[in-house]
Every structure is written in structure tokens, then in C-alpha cells.
């Protein structure tokens, strides 16, 4: 099971209990009398804890709390709250617990106790050992439940739930109604016995596991990995494997990317222009009769009031009742445009008396402020006060201003310019709604500056790169230290899968490289520990097999760790690359040819989220898709099974192709009879002229010499060979040479000759000639030897440099060939990656199309249209599954071929012509390549051909017997005719030889048997007139219109592998290596033996005598000389040796007594 059963907690009955689960992290209430059958069911009634707090005392410093009142409440505004006391509980006493309550808006439910006369305002006095649960609305009690303390000895918990306003006391339901209202406030009033723990909760859906009507386990659908997996598949039991999922509860944020860091906006300035009214009449009596002109009212924005005509008028200050009156306006009309703010503003002009006209207009509410100006007008304006209505006063200009304070309206002299500073706060690594340079959408933003900055993308003031659908793919933002590049990915990865190993949810496989992820094959793995993501750990362990879930060569264990699957037979496998040490002999009529061959042995695995591909994020489509049953599971099972079989076969392939060790045969003590196989075995070392005893008794000295040293050595062989030293001298290129080594005998001989030649002057001077001649010959030998060594060194260096050059060129050509293979495979992978990325983009388009269908049609028509889309997309997924199966079959066949190639071409020498390269196989070197293996075959191909006459066989016709036929035996070759004679030769190499009995097979007849195949036997042969193709096609494809959605158009050029030029270069390198032979000048090694001096031989003689004496003494003292008396002939011991020696005889002063003991049987 994926989840851990909570065996300590069981819900007993409907609407009667509520217990906290999972270390009190959530609570589950099943509120129905109907019990679902056993199994997992998606239910409501689960509440997850979002906040925890504690309180130790809220009764202050008093000796106890006051019973019968509600106190200590706190505002929560939550779906549920649980208030719990310590496990020992709290006593129903004012010294500890008084009241607990919950407020559901206008309804309050509480539990309390009160045993005082007149001191219980809420419940009245209760009898001893009774408690009261009550509910009241707007101060009026409407529910009472009296319970004995025998049922609840102490206060333990008080839980309130919004669903049907349920209240639980000590886990038992004590109040409910038919309303669902959130808890607004709650609290416990107590003095001691705490602390009281408050757990505020929110409502979530839950997947509950029922057994006999009782919930045994609960999984919250809260967006956690465990909740996402269980609630999407409606089960908590999962076997090991991979489970695609869709996270529809993504937290969405929003950000905007601006084109510029700041924007200047010029606002509109509204101009109001006032002028003098030339035809205005004097006002009648009373302020209400003053007529207004040119009323201008500002709405919102910026305004300019133009009073330029006032330049010919004289402003009249306020003087009691005369002139202007504007105490509420701290400005003059000349300064009204100086950036003043108003909520409302209206201006008009009028003509009235300067005496009291402004003041009375403000008092009567005609204006907020009034400004008076004199223009020398007539005194024809009537008064405005009650005693002056019939009096005439000087007429003046009155300007009415009606306003209120605020910020909707601002005055200005010029159009204002507003600068807006833009800050690009980009939210990374989460799903967001974005507005990037005016293009809106939803995506997962990642920073790709490190990988994109070196390519100078968008270097010419570009802002973004769009994909084929017109959406933003990559955009750039100017940062503090240069350009920053960001990539927009789909919010939901269609390849994301949960990994279940050992029955536990251990990780996530995704195609998105997130922080802390770990690359496994072509996916990224994120380990999950305790329901949360964790940073990656390196792979440090190898396992021989994986009993859990595996992905490629990686084994995912139940603790989430990763191990590499390495079968035991592969642990010590090391494949050398170009370490070729074999010697190949090539016939003159053949050329060495190098052929490369690439075989694919593995395939890229693809994971598709079926539900996401079909419906996108449309909830209506997903609801309709439930009618299709497990079709997605069937398609995914096909794709996943292909991946699993691919992994298993790949491991078996590597296991089966491991090179086995070869045991060296031991051929000692093997008799081959009359067959001489000495040429096949190692030649024994030839015996030297000196024996082992000579090598032991003489010191040898080796020296490098000329080829003439061998003749000199043979000439001086013998006991007195040193006398022939000068006579055995040889010539080399016209120079007399002797080996440079002189023994002691030669030195004594030549020294005595030189001394004798100097005894009598010129008479004996000729005796020095041998000494001078041998000295000159030895100097010649040394000079020539040094010259030859120098020449050989130059030849070796030149040839070695040439060989190294050819080897480097060969490795470079091989590297280029492999690089081309890498490029081809990489481009194929890039095409697949681009295809999957485009599918990700298309999923967003799918959601948009479905959403438009539901917006444009009613429910029935929309479901019909979406049903067609679902059918089409399921068909596409079926085609994908079939394609992966076909690809798997093809790759599996390629693996079988690769296995044959390794076994037949690499581990052995193939006898099949052109199976391992072109021509007859010599050697094959394997090399790892992307998704496969490259074989480099060395073979020899014909260079020249001989035109011969071939004969199938011979028909023999004896004189006195029936005729018979002979044909070549299998593998022996073919019969040929050369110059009238018949021979047999191999089919692939011209080697004519006489025909022997072992080369033929005898046939009983010279006739050939023919088998005729009738047309009716093989039914696959079809005449042209058997059926009409057009007629047959019209039956099944008649006026049928098939339209496929126009997704991204792919236009890819598939690369073709061509490395012929590199192979030609390798062949040239081989020819160059063949030419790098070294023809060195021949030298020889001369070994000269030098005898030891006389004192060495004297020491050897003394050591031999002492050894013999010690050996005789040992024989005498141990009485074991009986077998040696005749050999040594020691006469004084004969009498002792004549006696019988026994292990049981004791000697004292030679022979004193002789004791015999019984002999023991052995």
C-alpha cells in the first residue's frame, strides 16, 4: 500500500465522533448514516490543520474563573477549530475549567457547569455532577443538553465544524443543525489544568479507506504528492511503477515585464476660458435673483482656468459687507492654476452689487467662495440685504467658485508629464500568469542565462523569441550586469510521473530540470522524503539486480535512493578501445579494408500524460472522459511495458556480450605421435657452446659487436683459442676489426710480446707489431660500432615519428567518424525533443479549443464536439503506442544482430563472407556510440582476380558399375579447370590443389531432381484481375471527410550518416603504418668467459675437503655408517661398523652394554 494505515484511530459511527489523525495534523468527520462498501472512497469531511497556538490561563490573577459566563474568545474565521486539553483532562470546577464555546455567526454553542444560586445567568443553577451543553441565537437559548459527569469525567476537547454546524465534546457529537456556517470565533475560559491547544483548520477533500463501514485510513487531497497521486487515481494502494499525474491545484502568481524601465506620460490638460459678458443686465433685488454666466464644471483630471480678461478689472478686498468673501478658499483667481487639488470644482461669473453681493451669495449657498472685481460700472444694482433691497449700488463682477476637497481634480498651467518607474520582478520556478512585453499567457519561467549568453541571442535589440504557435519561448531583460535570458515552459509537464517503489511514493520523474533534480537516462528525478521534495544525492551504489522499480540502468529503492544496475558478470568488464596486439599476415593478392557499421541497441523512451493530452485543463472534458473507462491505462500500459522490456533486454544484451576469459592451454607432457606440431609451439632456446657448469665456473661479459663477431667466436673456439686472437681478425668494409674485449690470457700474451720487443732495441722491435695491430683493430671495431648505433637510432626515431603520425591521423579519422555518428544520433534526439516540446505547447492549444467549444455551444452539443476530439486524440495516442511497439521490435532485432556481431566478429573470426565487413574477416573492434555500438571491421578484399572455369561436379561412369556423381564437400571450395587439369580451390581465395577423397561427396545418381511449385500451393500469388482496387477502396472510403487538427508543422531534415571519407583516411593510415618498417644495420652480441684466479680454486678445494670430513663425522656419531663403510674405506671404523647398529642400542665408552627393547609394530 502507498499509505501507512493509522491503526490507532477508528471512527466508530456516523455523526458521533471526531478524532485527530497523523500526529494531530488533520481531523476527519464522516457525516452520513449510509456507510460505503469496503475500499477507498473520495469523501468530504476532512479538515487540515493550518495554525496551532496554546494558552495556559485566561482567568487572570483571580483564584478561579467565573462559571456560567462566556469569556476568552478569539477570532478564527475558519472551517473548523479544535480546542484540546492535556490527556489527563480538566476538572469541572471554577479552579480549572468554566466554559468552552464556538460562534457560528449569530449562533453560539457552549458547554459549562454552574452550581450557585443566582450566579448562573446563562443556564441557571444545575444539580451537582451535571454539565450543560446549550445553543443560543441573538441571546435567546433554543437548545439544551444536560449530561452527567459520569459520561464525561473531565473536559478533554471541544471541536466545532462548519459542516451542519457540528459540535463535538470529547470527540462525541453534542450539537448539529441543517446549516453550514464557518466558525467566526471560539475559546475556552479556564484557570488551571492547561494548556489549551487551539488547532485552526481548513476543509479539504479526502480519500478514505473503509472496512465494514469504518474509516481506517484517510489521505487528504491537499496538493501534496501523496494527495495528488491518491486522489487522482482514487486509490491508496499502488504497486511499484510510474504513475503520470496532473497538478490542477497550481498556485498562480502574476508579473509584468516592461519594455522600458520608466515611462513618461503626458496628461491631457482641459482649458476653461472665461470672458466679460457685454450684454449683462443689472440684477434685481435679492441675492437669489443674481444671474450667473459661463458656468464651467470640472469632472476629473487636469484643468486650467483662464481669467485673462480680469486684467482690466480691479480686485476688491473683503471689507465687512463690501467686496470679496472667500474664507474657505486660500487662493486668488490669479493663483488657482498653481497645482491645487479638488474633489469637485465649478466656476461661474455674475454681475451684482459690490455691497454685500459676495458675502450674501456665500451665506445663501450659491457658492463656496466669491471674488469681487470693479470695472467702474453704473450704480444700478439692487441691494441684497432686507433693508437695502430698493437701494442702488455700484455694479461689479462676481466670480463664484463651488468646490470640495479631494484629489480627483488638479489645476495646472501646462500639460503635466508623469514618470512611471517600472520594476521587473520576475517570478521563477513556479506557474504564473505573465504579461511579457504586452503578450499575456501562463507558464513556468526558468533562468537560462548561463546556457544562452554565449550565443548572443537577441543581441540586436530583440526582446523575445516566439515559437511556431506565436507564444513567447525565450525573452530577454536588461539586468544590472547585462542581459538576462528566461525561458517560458508549460506549467504542467506532460511527462511528469510519480515513482512508487516498495509500495511507497519515493520520487517524481519529470522532463524539467528543476533545482535538486538528478538526471536518470533522459528524465530528471526528484526524491520525495516525508511528502516533500529533497535535494539530490549522488549515485554511489551498484546492485546486481533490482527487485523494485527500475528506469533504464537505474534502480529506485523504497527509500528513494538510486543505485546502478550492474550484473555480476559485468562488474569487472573493461573494453579496450584500440589496444590491438595481434600480428596479421596479408596475402599479396588482397588488400586490407576497414568498414564501419553502426547498430542501434537502445531506444529513447517516451512518457505521455494521457489525460492531460486528451483534455488539457478542461474540467468538463475530464468529466466526459470518465465514460471511456480505462482506455488511458491500456495505452500507458503498452508504452510502459515497452520501456520495461527495453530495459530488461538491454541488460541481458550487455550481460550476454561480455567477453569471457580464455584459459591458456598447457601442452606439457603431451604426445602427438607422428604429427609434428613444433612449429605451433614456442621454440626452445638453442644450447650455447658453453655448458651450465661453464656458466657457473666462469664469469661472462657481453658486448655489442659487428656481424663479424660470430666468425671470430667460431675461429677462437677451443682450449688455446686466445693464441689465435690476431689470426682470427676479420675485415668490415675494408677495415681490420677485433672485438674490444681482452681476457687475462690475451693481456698477458700481448704484454709479454711488447716487453720482449723492447729488450734489445731495434733487433727485437718487430715483436711489437702484434700488439699494435690488435690495438688498431679493436679501435676500428669501437668506431664502426658507434657509427652503426647512431644510424640505427636515427632510423628508429624517423620511423617511430612516421608511425606516430599515421596513428594520430588514424585516431583523428576514427574520432571524426564517431563524431558524425554522435551528430546524427543527437539530431535525431533533438527532433524527438522538439516534438515533445511542441506537444507541450499544443496542450495549451487543446485546452483553449475545448474551452471555446463549451463557450459557444450548449452542454449537449459541446459534449458531442468534445467527444469527437477525445476519440481523435485517443486514436493519436494509440498510433503512438503502436509506433513505440514497432520501434521496440526493430531495436530488439538490432540487438540480436549486435549480439551475433559481437560473438562472431569480436570474440572470434567469422567464416561468413562479408558478414563482418566487406570480404573475408580478420579483426573487429567495437566502440560505444550514442544509443548503439559502432563496429570497425578489418577485412581483406580481393585486389586481382583470376578467370577460371568452374565445374559444379563430376559424373563418374565406371565400366562395370552404375554411374555416380561427386561434388565438392561443404566448405571445401569448388572444382576448377586449369590447363586441361581439374583442381579444387577455396571459393574466396585462389589456391588450386589436387582433389582428394576428403574434398568430395558422392551422389547416387548424376540426375538432378526438380520440384515444381503449383500456383494453387502458394495462395499469396494474385493475378491483376483478381479484384478492383478502386472499387474496393470506394466501399470503405466513400465521401468520408477526415480532418485532423492543425498543430505545429514539423519540417525536419533527417541527417544521413556518411563517413566514407574518414574510412578512406583510415585505410591510408594503415598503408602508412605498413610502410613504417625499420631496416636496421645488423649488430651482434659477443659473450666472453673469463677464468677465475688460482686462489679462488684453492679456496674451493679447501671447502670440499672440510665438507667431506664433517659428513664422515656425522655418519660416525649417529651410527648410520653401515651403508657407507664400503664407500669411504675408513679402516679404523671397520670394527665398529661390523656390529649391528640399532636404534635401541646405548653406547658408553664405545660399547659397554647392549640393551634390547621389544620392537613396536609400525
Swiss-Prot record:
Annotated phenotype, changing residue 623 to N: In strain: Isolate Vero cell-adapted p36 and Isolate Vero cell-adapted p65
Result of mutating residue 1160 to A? Localizes exclusively to the cell membrane
Residue ranges that the UniProt entry lists as topological domain Extracellular: 19-1095
Q: Where is this motif: Di-lysine motif?
A: 1159-1162
| Keyword list, A-Z | Cleavage on pair of basic residues, Coiled coil, Fusion of virus membrane with host endosomal membrane, Fusion of virus membrane with host membrane, Glycoprotein, Host membrane, Host-virus interaction, Membrane, Signal, Transmembrane, Transmembrane helix, Viral attachment to host cell, Viral envelope protein, Viral penetration into host cytoplasm, Virion, Virulence, Virus endocytosis by host, Virus entry into host cell
Sorted alphabetically, the Gene Ontology cellular component annotations on this record are: host cell endoplasmic reticulum-Golgi intermediate compartment membrane; membrane; viral envelope; virion membrane
| GO BP term, pick one | fusion of virus membrane with host plasma membrane
Q: Where is this region: Heptad repeat 1 (HR1)?
A: 769-874
Quote the record's domain comment.
The di-lysine motif confers endoplasmic reticulum localization for type I membrane proteins.
What is the name listed in the Swiss-Prot or TrEMBL entry for this protein?
Answer: Spike glycoprotein
Amino acid at each position: 500500500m502507498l499509505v501507512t494505515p493509522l491503526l490507532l484511530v477508528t471512527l466508530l459511527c456516523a455523526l458521533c465522533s471526531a478524532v485527530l489523525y497523523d500526529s494531530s495534523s488533520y481531523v476527519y468527520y464522516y457525516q452520513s448514516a449510509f456507510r460505503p462498501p469496503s475500499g477507498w472512497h473520495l469523501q468530504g469531511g476532512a479538515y487540515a490543520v493550518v495554525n496551532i497556538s496554546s494558552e495556559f490561563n485566561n482567568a487572570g490573577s483571580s483564584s478561579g474563573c467565573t462559571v456560567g459566563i462566556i469569556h476568552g474568545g478569539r477570532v478564527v474565521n475558519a472551517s473548523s477549530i479544535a480546542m484540546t486539553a492535556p490527556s489527563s483532562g480538566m476538572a469541572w470546577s471554577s479552579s480549572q475549567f468554566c466554559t468552552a464555546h464556538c460562534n457560528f455567526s449569530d449562533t453560539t454553542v457552549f458547554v459549562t457547569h454552574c452550581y450557585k444560586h443566582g450566579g448562573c445567568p446563562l443556564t441557571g443553577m444545575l444539580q451537582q455532577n451535571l454539565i450543560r451543553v446549550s445553543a443560543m441565537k441573538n441571546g435567546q437559548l433554543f437548545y439544551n443538553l444536560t449530561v452527567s459527569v459520569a459520561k464525561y469525567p473531565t473536559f478533554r476537547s471541544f471541536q466545532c465544524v462548519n459542516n451542519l454546524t457540528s459540535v463535538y465534546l470529547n470527540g462525541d457529537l453534542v450539537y448539529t443543525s441543517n446549516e453550514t456556517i464557518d466558525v467566526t470565533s471560539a475559546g475556552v475560559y479556564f484557570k488551571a489544568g492547561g494548556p489549551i491547544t487551539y488547532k485552526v483548520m481548513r476543509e479539504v477533500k479526502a480519500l478514505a479507506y473503509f472496512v465494514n463501514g469504518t474509516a481506517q485510513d484517510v489521505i487528504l487531497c491537499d496538493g501534496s504528492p501523496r494527495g495528488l497521486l491518491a486522489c487522482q487515481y482514487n486509490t491508496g494502494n499502488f504497486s511499484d511503477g510510474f504513475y503520470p499525474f496532473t497538478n490542477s491545484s497550481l498556485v498562480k502568481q502574476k508579473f509584468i515585464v516592461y519594455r522600458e524601465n520608466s515611462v513618461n506620460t503626458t496628461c491631457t490638460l482641459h482649458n476653461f476660458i472665461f470672458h466679460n459678458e457685454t450684454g449683462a443686465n443689472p440684477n434685481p433685488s435679492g441675492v437669489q435673483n443674481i444671474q450667473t454666466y459661463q458656468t464651467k464644471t470640472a469632472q476629473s483630471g487636469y484643468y486650467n482656468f483662464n481669467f485673462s480678461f480680469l486684467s482690466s478689472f480691479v480686485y476688491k478686498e473683503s471689507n465687512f459687507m463690501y467686496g470679496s468673501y472667500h474664507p474657505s478658499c486660500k487662493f486668488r483667481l490669479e493663483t488657482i492654476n498653481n497645482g491645487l487639488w479638488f474633489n469637485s470644482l465649478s466656476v461661474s461669473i455674475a454681475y451684482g452689487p459690490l455691497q454685500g453681493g459676495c458675502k450674501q451669495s456665500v451665506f445663501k449657498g450659491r457658492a463656496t467662495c466669491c471674488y469681487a472685481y470693479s470695472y467702474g460700472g453704473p450704480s444700478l444694482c439692487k441691494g441684497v440685504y432686507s433693508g437695502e433691497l430698493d437701494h442702488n449700488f455700484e455694479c461689479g463682477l462676481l466670480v463664484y467658485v463651488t468646490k470640495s476637497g479631494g484629489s480627483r481634480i488638479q489645476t495646472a498651467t501646462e500639460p503635466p508629464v508623469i514618470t512611471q518607474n517600472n520594476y521587473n520582478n520576475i517570478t521563477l520556478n513556479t506557474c504564473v500568469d505573465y504579461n511579457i512585453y504586452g503578450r499575456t499567457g501562463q507558464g513556468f519561467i526558468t533562468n537560462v542565462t548561463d546556457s544562452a549568453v554565449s550565443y548572443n541571442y537577441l543581441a540586436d535589440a530583440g526582446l523575445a523569441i516566439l515559437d511556431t504557435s506565436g507564444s513567447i519561448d525565450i525573452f530577454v531583460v536588461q539586468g544590472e550586469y547585462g542581459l538576462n535570458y528566461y525561458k517560458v515552459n508549460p506549467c504542467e509537464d506532460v511527462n511528469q510521473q510519480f515513482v512508487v517503489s516498495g509500495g511507497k511514493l519515493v520520487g517524481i520523474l519529470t522532463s524539467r530540470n528543476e533545482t535538486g533534480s538528478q538526471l536518470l537516462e533522459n528524465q530528471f528525478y526528484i526524491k520525495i522524503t516525508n511528502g516533500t521534495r529533497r535535494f539530490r544525492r549522488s549515485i554511489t551504489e551498484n546492485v546486481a539486480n533490482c527487485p523494485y522499480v527500475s528506469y533504464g540502468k537505474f534502480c529506485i529503492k523504497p527509500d528513494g535512493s538510486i543505485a546502478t544496475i550492474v550484473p555480476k558478470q559485468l562488474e569487472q568488464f573493461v573494453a579496450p578501445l584500440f589496444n590491438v596486439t595481434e600480428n596479421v599476415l596479408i596475402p599479396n593478392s588482397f588488400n586490407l579494408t576497414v568498414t564501419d557499421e553502426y547498430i542501434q541497441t537502445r531506444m529513447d523512451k517516451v512518457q505521455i500524460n494521457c489525460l492531460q493530452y486528451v483534455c488539457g485543463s478542461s474540467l468538463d472534458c475530464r468529466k466526459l472522459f470518465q465514460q471511456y473507462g480505462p482506455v488511458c491505462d491500456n495505452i500507458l500500459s503498452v508504452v510502459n511495458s515497452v520501456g520495461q522490456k527495453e530495459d530488461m533486454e538491454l541488460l541481458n544484451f550487455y550481460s550476454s556480450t561480455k567477453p569471457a576469459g580464455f584459459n591458456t592451454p598447457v601442452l606439457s607432457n603431451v604426445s602427438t605421435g607422428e604429427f609434428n606440431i613444433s612449429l605451433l609451439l614456442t621454440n626452445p632456446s638453442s644450447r650455447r657452446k658453453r655448458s651450465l657448469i661453464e656458466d657457473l665456473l666462469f664469469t661472462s661479459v657481453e658486448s655489442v659487436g659487428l656481424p663479424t663477431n660470430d666468425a671470430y667466436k667460431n675461429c677462437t673456439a677451443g682450449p688455446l683459442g686466445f693464441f689465435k686472437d690476431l689470426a682470427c681478425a676479420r675485415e668490415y668494409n675494408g677495415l681490420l676489426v677485433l672485438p674490444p674485449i681482452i681476457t687475462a690470457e690475451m693481456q698477458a700474451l700481448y704484454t709479454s710480446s711488447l716487453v720482449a720487443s723492447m729488450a734489445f732495441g731495434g733487433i727485437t722491435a718487430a715483436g711489437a707489431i702484434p700488439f699494435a695491430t690488435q690495438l688498431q683493430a679493436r679501435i676500428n671495431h669501437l668506431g664502426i660500432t658507434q657509427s652503426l648505433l647512431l644510424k640505427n637510432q636515427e632510423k628508429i626515431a624517423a620511423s617511430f615519428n612516421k608511425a606516430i603520425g599515421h596513428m594520430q591521423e588514424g585516431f583523428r579519422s576514427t574520432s571524426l567518424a564517431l563524431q558524425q555518428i554522435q551528430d546524427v544520433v543527437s539530431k535525431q534526439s533533438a527532433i524527438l525533443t522538439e516534438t515533445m516540446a511542441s506537444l507541450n505547447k499544443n496542450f495549451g492549444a487543446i485546452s483553449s479549443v475545448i474551452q471555446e467549444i463549451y463557450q459557444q455551444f450548449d452542454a449537449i452539443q459541446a459534449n458531442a464536439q468534445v467527444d469527437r476530439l477525445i476519440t481523435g486524440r485517443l486514436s493519436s495516442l494509440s498510433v503512438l503506442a503502436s509506433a513505440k511497439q514497432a520501434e521496440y521490435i526493430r531495436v530488439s532485432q538490432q540487438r540480436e544482430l549486435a549480439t551475433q556481431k559481437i560473438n562472431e566478429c569480436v570474440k572470434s573470426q567469422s567464416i561468413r563472407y562479408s558478414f563482418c565487413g566487406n570480404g573475408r574477416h580478420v579483426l573487429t573492434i567495437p566502440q560505444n556510440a550514442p544509443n548503439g555500438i559502432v563496429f570497425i571491421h578489418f577485412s581483406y578484399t580481393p585486389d586481382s582476380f583470376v578467370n577460371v572455369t568452374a565445374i559444379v561436379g563430376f559424373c563418374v561412369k565406371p565400366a562395370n558399375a552404375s554411374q555416380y556423381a561427386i561434388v565438392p564437400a561443404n566448405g571445401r571450395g569448388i572444382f576448377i579447370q586449369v590447363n586441361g587439369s581439374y583442381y579444387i580451390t577455396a571459393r574466396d581465395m585462389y589456391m588450386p590443389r589436387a582433389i582428394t577423397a576428403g574434398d568430395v561427396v558422392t551422389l547416387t545418381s548424376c540426375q538432378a531432381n526438380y520440384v515444381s511449385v503449383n500456383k494453387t500451393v502458394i495462395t499469396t500469388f494474385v493475378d491483376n484481375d483478381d479484384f478492383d482496387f478502386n472499387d474496393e477502396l470506394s466501399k470503405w472510403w466513400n465521401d468520408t471527410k477526415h480532418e485532423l487538427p492543425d498543430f505545429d508543422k514539423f519540417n525536419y531534415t533527417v541527417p544521413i550518416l556518411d563517413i566514407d571519407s574518414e574510412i578512406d583516411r583510415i585505410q591510408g593510415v594503415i598503408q602508412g603504418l605498413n610502410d613504417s618498417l625499420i631496416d636496421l644495420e645488423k649488430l651482434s652480441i659477443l659473450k666472453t668467459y673469463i677464468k677465475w684466479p688460482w686462489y679462488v680454486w684453492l679456496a674451493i678445494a679447501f671447502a670440499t675437503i672440510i665438507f667431506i670430513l664433517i659428513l664422515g663425522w656425522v655418519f660416525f656419531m649417529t651410527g648410520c655408517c653401515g651403508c657407507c663403510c664400503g664407500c669411504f674405506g675408513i679402516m679404523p671404523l671397520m670394527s665398529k661398523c661390523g656390529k649391528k647398529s640399532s636404534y635401541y642400542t646405548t653406547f658408553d665408552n664405545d660399547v659397554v652394554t647392549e640393551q634390547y627393547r621389544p620392537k613396536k609394530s609400525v
